[in-house]
C-alpha cells in the first residue's frame, strides 16, 4: 500500500489514450485532468467537438450570445458523466468571482456555474475557454489502474493545445509533447 506522499498527482496533465484503448468513449482522446487525488480524478476531453455550437447552446439556456466570432465555436463532449451539465475550462479572469469555480493547479480554472457563460455572452468573461458537456471521472485508484494497464500516457498539459490548436490536431500535438506520434506509438508495452 502506498503512502499518500508516494502518490503521483496528475492534476494539470493530459491523459492521452493509447491505441489499445478498449473503451470507444475514450479511443483517440486527450483528457485534461482538472483534479486528481486519493479520492479519484476528474477531467475533460478536449478533442471531441460535438455538432452543437455556442449559439445554439446559449439559446437553449436563454442567454443571448452577442459576440459574432464566438457563435459557431463548438461545444465539446467532455466525457460520459453528467452529460447535460456544462463545464468551462478557461484561463483565470482577473477580478472574476464565479460562483462554482475551481482553480486547477498550474493556472487554469474550471467553472460549472452559469455566471461564467453570462460573462462570455457579454464579452466580460474569459477570452480563452473550452466549453464541454459532461466530464470524465474515475473513482479512487481507478485511473492509476488504467495507467498501469497501459491505457493512458500522461504528460504535463500545455494550454496552447487546449485553446490554440485545432481539435483534430490536439491528439498528435499532445503526443508531440512526449516526442512521439501516433504512427510510432504501439498499443503493446511491457513492464520490467
Curated annotation (Swiss-Prot):
Protein name as annotated: UPF0301 protein Bmul_2524/BMULJ_00714
Pfam short name (any one): DUF179
Domain of life, source organism: Bacteria
One annotated Gene Ontology cellular component of this protein: cytosol
Family: Belongs to the UPF0301 (AlgH) family.
Amino acid at each position: 500500500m502506498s503512502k499518500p506522499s508516494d502518490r503521483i498527482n496528475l492534476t494539470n496533465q493530459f491523459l492521452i489514450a493509447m491505441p489499445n484503448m478498449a473503451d470507444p468513449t475514450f479511443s483517440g482522446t486527450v483528457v485534461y485532468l482538472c483534479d486528481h487525488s486519493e479520492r479519484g480524478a476528474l477531467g475533460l476531453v478536449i478533442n471531441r467537438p460535438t455538432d452543437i455550437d455556442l449559439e445554439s447552446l446559449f439559446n437553449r439556456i436563454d442567454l443571448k450570445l452577442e459576440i459574432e466570432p464566438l457563435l459557431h465555436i463548438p461545444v465539446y463532449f467532455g466525457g460520459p458523466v453528467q452529460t447535460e451539465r456544462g463545464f468551462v475550462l478557461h484561463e483565470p479572469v482577473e477580478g472574476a468571482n464565479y460562483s462554482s469555480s475551481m482553480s486547477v493547479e498550474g493556472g487554469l480554472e474550471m467553472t460549472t456555474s452559469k455566471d461564467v457563460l453570462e460573462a462570455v455572452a457579454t464579452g466580460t468573461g474569459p477570452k480563452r475557454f473550452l466549453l464541454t458537456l459532461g466530464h470524465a471521472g474515475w473513482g479512487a485508484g481507478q485511473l492509476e489502474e488504467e495507467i498501469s494497464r497501459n491505457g493512458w500516457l500522461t504528460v504535463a498539459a500545455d494550454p496552447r493545445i487546449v485553446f490554440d490548436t485545432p481539435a483534430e490536431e490536439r491528439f498528435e500535438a499532445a503526443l508531440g509533447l512526449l516526442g512521439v506520434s501516433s504512427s510510432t506509438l504501439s498499443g503493446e508495452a511491457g513492464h520490467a
